[in-house]
Amino acid sequence: MKHLLSMADLSADEITGLLDEAQNFKEALEGRELKKLPTLRGRTIFTVFYENSTRTRSSFETAGKWMSADVINISASSSSVKKGESLQDTGLTLTAIGADALIIRHPSSGAAQQLAHWVAPNGDGPSVINAGDGAHQHPTQALLDALTLRQRLGGINGRKIVIVGDILHSRVARSNAELLTKLGAEVVYVAPPTLLPYGVETWPVRISYDMDSELADADAIMMLRVQAERMAGGFFPSHREYATLYGMSTAREAKMKDKAIIMHPGPMLRGMEINYSVADAPRTAVLQQVNNGVHVRMAVLFSLIIGTHGQSHTTKES
């Protein structure tokens, strides 16, 4: 595997392999006072973000540094992008500098795929990792969600996962639907009709407009943020009505199975899609998702830059 651009790039076996690798990294670092492995020493990773990020960017940076890579952050607001430099020229510049991997977040769907074409036309350039491209894909988020589900539920096959909220603008919803169904889960989208994408009926999911009817037998409820920055208005009458119909309240939490969990990719809008107290409830796995993100991204970087043949990631510092 050269790049990670979409969940379509991965088979069920490859997904399971990455999740196993992430779990191995987690266990290798557990209890260490110094969280440092020599796995990527001498490698150079650039994060190139054209959109704001807290979790994804810091998680990738931490993942690279915990494997001893040199991680350099490029922000559109403080680079030559501000002067009008194209994505193509930015990518080629960083490739010429010596990048081993480029991690890109971009508002345009397909940007990561295009970047990979520019920097590695013959497969000999840096690996490209899609950290979110418009409403298209966010593969590492889906992987960390799957790892969290596996840890909390004991497995994914046969589980019912309900994804609630702004499906229309959510790359997380798309990536999770692809990954989870490959691993044998039932995925249900719950949203108002105005927040469902055109053609969603062809996706490997079931559509529901009634959140309450899906709670009792769900193994996990994944709440999504309403992405107001991608809306011009008119998608729902008011925040209050949205919270009433599609928010995770204490009353709705009480209807869930004892071992069912609540997830959220972040950032959370407390008081809108999730109640303040529910956000901090024991069944809510948000911080576990964040923690797993580091280990999943370690596994992805290791797999793309080094490969999984003949090298241990747990080699001790000499």
Swiss-Prot record:
Protein's pathway: Pyrimidine metabolism; UMP biosynthesis via de novo pathway; (S)-dihydroorotate from bicarbonate: step 2/3
InterPro entries xref list: Asp/Orn_carbamoyltranf_P-bd, Asp/Orn_carbamoylTrfase, Asp/Orn_carbamoylTrfase_sf, Asp_carbamoyltransf, Asp_carbamoyltransf_Asp/Orn-bd
EC number: 2.1.3.2
Pfam families xref list: OTCace (PF00185), OTCace_N (PF02729)
GO process annotations (BP): 'de novo' pyrimidine nucleobase biosynthetic process; 'de novo' UMP biosynthetic process; amino acid metabolic process
Family assignment from sequence similarity: Belongs to the aspartate/ornithine carbamoyltransferase superfamily. ATCase family.
Name listed for the protein in its UniProt record: Aspartate carbamoyltransferase catalytic subunit
Gene that this polypeptide is encoded by: pyrB
